Amino acid sequence: MALRKPTDDENALLDLMIARADAFTPSAADRTGLSVETMNDGGMGSLRLFPPGTRGKSRVFGRRVSDWAFDDLDGVQVTVALVVDANDRLYELELWKSDFGRLLRLPELPAK
């Protein structure tokens, strides 16, 4: 998949997840220079996150820093997790729809 800038809706969800994070605050450079890549998750909406300077580098899962859930348009619950790598840099925004279906829409959240 190709790298791209996050959409406004993805940015709003990232902002919410960062605000809910336990003992984690990304650097301003990591947040403003962030690129994303859609993960091959069957259309559930998960993103691999690439702060500046991380593309092409070996990175590993560090920890989950926040969780949240919302209902998709069809009423099916979607669980969201923000994950950082072992160096505490943004790593993945994981979305999991409980029926394994495709995400219909990200939640409507106010943009910053």
What residue spans do the PLM features occupy?
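N-terminal domain-onset segments
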Residues: M1-D67, L104-K112
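Short, compact, well-ordered microdomains
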Residues: D71-K112
